[in-house]
A protein has these predicted regions:
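Acidic, low-complexity, intrinsically disordered peripheral segments
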Residues: 30, 216, 409-434
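Bacterial N-terminal signal peptides that target proteins for export
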Residues: 1-11
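N-terminal signal peptide c-region/cleavage motif recognized by signal peptidases
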Residues: 18-20
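Periplasmic alpha-helical coiled-coil/stalk elements that build and connect Gram-negative outer-membrane
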Residues: 130-247, 359, 363, 405, ...
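Sec/SRP-type N-terminal targeting helices
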Residues: 44-48, 61-65, 69, 86, ...
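Bacterial Sec-pathway N-terminal export signals of envelope proteins
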Residues: 22-69, 216, 222-263, 346, ...
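Small/polar, glycine/serine/threonine/aspartate-rich low-complexity segments that form flexible
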Residues: 24, 71-98, 109, 226-236, ...
């Protein structure tokens, strides 16, 4: 029989093996987060919304400035019942206007648009957080899948070695045909598990590649010091929930964006109320022209026809059919919606933090339990080997014990990366990955 201690040592050596030298294009977690910030389509869309908000601010500011326009009007006309000929008229002019007073609507609108721009910038930061969270999930999933694949590869190699060894024993008449067939069946099952593990790695890598917006023909590997962590005891202690909650609320761009949006909505309500305000406008105009189809006095017409004017207009709204009242009501509804959104997002954050914190604590305990389970299954396999050699244990029971060890190793891997992911997400919510 193959020495079981040697098998166990080889199994763990291969399962824990991490390639030291990767091909060109190796990515750390920090590299992935930077690439996602640079290339994410979601972030690109958010930045475009920022640009749109910036343009709105500029438009709001320019609306309070003077306007100047020039005009050139060419007219061809006739009097069919008076003169039997066509006449030509040319009018030239330049005019300008400036709003002296609009009840403060323009300045309020500028303030509102500025706040909206600030809220949009914070919303972009929240989108960045969301992208980072997706990258973290994909990155840790790929690490876990890769480690499970190494476990599956080790299992296949050991099962192949055992099958080859059993083939020799069968030829020597030391084991039965049944034992050899079971060994072959075990090898096929391990190869099937290996294919499943390969598919998981491929799926996880595709997910991460798409988040990083890399071409599908780009080959890349990931590397992380997390693969060498053996126990949660070697990690920093989790913060208290109160500290986590305080840090997360202070560092959450989404809450800040909602808070600024509420202020912007309040300004919009004030702007809507200015619809019935008196408006004072200063205007100026300068114009000239000429007429007649044929004339030698074009120059004189332009000269003596020149006219300048200045006007002061005062608009006093009296009845607007309820338009201003409707705009105020709509603005108040939007303001209330912004306040409700802020409260809902705050509750959502609290719920997410509570779940995430409990998951992190639970994952640490599951990780420790999985370590003990692997140790227990390893000892059980040593005993099973001794019983098998003594003829007190069937090969089927021996295979069951080997499979239990492999399952325990997979459980350990999943628990490990679940814990690491939970901790990274806590850091993300605390703003430590910005």
């Amino acid at each position: 029989m193959i020495n079981t201690k040697v098998l166990i040592n080889a199994f763990f050596a291969m399962a824990a093996f991490t390639t030291a030298v990767f091909a060109e294009g190796t990515w750390t977690l920090e590299d992935c987060l930077k690439q996602a910030k640079k290339s994410s389509l979601k972030l690109e869309s958010a930045k475009l919304r920022e640009q749109s908000a910036d343009i709105s601010v500029k438009q709001a500011k320019s609306s309070g400035g003077p306007t100047v326009s020039a005009s050139i009007q060419n007219t061809l006309y006739d009097h069919p019942f008076v003169y039997n000929e066509d006449h030509y008229r040319l009018n030239l002019g330049i005019s300008g206007s400036y709003t002296l007073w609009d009840g403060g609507a323009t300045s309020l609108n500028v303030e509102s648009k500025t706040l909206t721009k600030e809220a949009t910038a914070l919303a972009t930061q929240q989108t960045e957080r969301s992208v980072q969270e997706s990258v973290l999930n994909a990155y840790m999933s790929l690490l876990a899948a890769s480690e499970n694949l190494r476990t599956a590869d080790a299992s296949v190699e050991l099962a192949q070695a055992e099958f080859d060894h059993y083939g020799k024993l069968y030829e020597a008449g030391s084991i039965t045909k049944k034992d050899l067939t079971q060994s072959q069946s075990n090898l096929l099952q391990k190869q099937t598990s290996q294919l499943t593990a390969q598919l998981s790695v491929s799926t996880a890598k595709t997910t991460l590649r798409q988040l990083l917006e890399l071409d599908d023909n780009v080959e890349f590997q990931i590397t992380a010091p997390e693969t060498n962590i053996e126990s949660p005891d070697s990690l920093e202690a989790l913060p208290t929930y109160e500290q986590l909650k305080a840090d997360a609320q202070n560092a959450h761009p989404g809450l800040k964006s909602d808070s600024v949006s509420v202020r912007a909505a309040q300004k919009n309500t004030e702007v809507a109320g200015k619809g019935n305000s008196i408006t004072v406008t200063l205007g100026a105009n300068s114009s000239t022209g000429l007429q007649a189809w044929q004339s030698k006095a074009y120059k004189d017409q332009l000269k003596y026809g020149w006219q300048n004017s200045i006007t002061l207009g005062i608009n006093i709204p009296i009845i607007d059919g309820g338009a201003t009242a409707s705009k105020v009501l709509q603005a108040q509804v939007s303001e209330t919606e912004s306040q409700v959104s802020l409260k809902e997002d705050l509750k959502t954050l609290e719920n997410n933090l509570e779940k995430l914190y409990l998951n992190a604590m639970s994952a640490d305990m599951q990780w420790k339990a999985a370590i003990l389970q692997v140790q227990a299954e390893s000892e059980a396999l040593v005993v099973a080997e001794e019983q098998r050699n003594a003829g007190a244990l069937t090969y089927t029971d021996f295979l069951t014990q080997k499979n239990n060890l492999e399952k325990a190793q997979i459980t350990l891997t999943n628990a490990k990366y679940t814990s690491l992911l939970s901790r990274k997400l806590l850091e993300l919510y605390q703003g430590k990955l910005d």
